[in-house]
Amino acid sequence: MNVYVRELSREIGARGLAVDIFTRSQDPSRQRVRNLWPNVRVIHVPAGPEEPYDKHLVFNHLPQFTIGLREFAAAEGASYDLVHSHYWLSGWVARELAREWRLPTVHMFHTLGKMKNAVAQSEQERAPSERIRVEGELMRDMDRVVAATPLDRGQMVDLYGIDPKKIRIIPLGVDLDLFRPIPRDKAVAAIGVDIPSQHHLVLFVGRLDPLKGLETLFQALCRLRRSEPRLAEKMCLAVIGGDADRDSVRLSDDLECLDKLKQDMDVTDLVVFLGSRAQNTLPYYYSAAEVCVVPSHYESFGLVALEAMACGTPVIASRVGGLQLTVEDGVTGFLVPAGDADALAEKLKLILLGADLRKQLAANARRRAQAYTWQSVADHVIDLYEELWQQAL
């Protein structure tokens, strides 16, 4: 979501529209107002502890955030023409201020609580009740809602009863200048991970969240170790993950769970955990990998798959959500049933042992990704803004 907000704001600002991005302050020493690009600035508003914080507790501080945003706008003499919010927490704030300022609203959920609950495997994975309630209210109250895919749109209509006329389908984009194929030897040297040239690097990029399906990927590695021991000897899974917004205690718990999974499935020696990585370094990791795996149980779109494809890296993804539309099965990679470790292991074997197949999938992946640009996303979003402004005349 951070990538989406950043890249969309940059493109909108480049077209001459002024954009203020309001976010919760997580560091009291950080500059409160920072100019990102021409016409785009980010404002850090204190609300709750000024540190990485459990997102499930942020809801309690939304009134404070709303007051802080209102006070900033008043002090600056700022006036706005539209409020565009992302995720249900920001949507709550946007609705309150838009009512007060009588402004049109656009909202993007990115993920849906009811969809998360549909695939949750434990009570801890379920969305809180206030999220479900607020999402329903936002479906009703927002002027327009952006869906990333037709599947996303259908879920909103079926699960929340939103008026389908409110929804506009606008896919995500990828920075094709940043995410580009890099020669593998150069990429491997740049990332600094000790991988022998003849070894196969498998890549996972994502939050350390059960919904992301890492357990299924570990199970697939375990299957390959039994069925293809010679392949397993020359295979390494690099895990890039960790949420900067997650508090240190919960992140530590995630890492402990990850280590236990590796041990239980006897794949500790096949997995290296790299932690979080800066966005501008990810193309080197994607390009160093022979395949990127996105084994999620739920994805509204799946930006990681698109980034990997833009780097010419084949993708194996779960047949869920927007991944079904982004990844072309048998063309840019493979789709497998979510949670099916056997199917995932079989596709990993095909790609890792098939150099010619890998080469063809890689070429197709890059071509496919070129259809998704942030310039196109911004064009469609600005068209939506113009539609609302015309209605307000």
Named regions from a protein language model:
Residues 276, 284-289:
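Short alpha-helical donor nucleotide-sugar binding micro-motif in glycosyltransferases
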Residues 180-195:
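A short helix/loop element that forms part of the nucleotide-sugar donor recognition site in Leloir-type
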Residues 151, 173:
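Carbohydrate-associated surface elements
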Residues 297:
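Aromatic "clamp/platform" in nucleotide-sugar-dependent glycosyltransferases that forms part
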Residues 329-330, 334-341, 350-355:
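Conserved acidic donor-binding segment of nucleotide-sugar-dependent glycosyltransferases
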Residues 314-317, 327:
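Short hydrophobic beta-strand element within catalytic cores of glycosyltransferases
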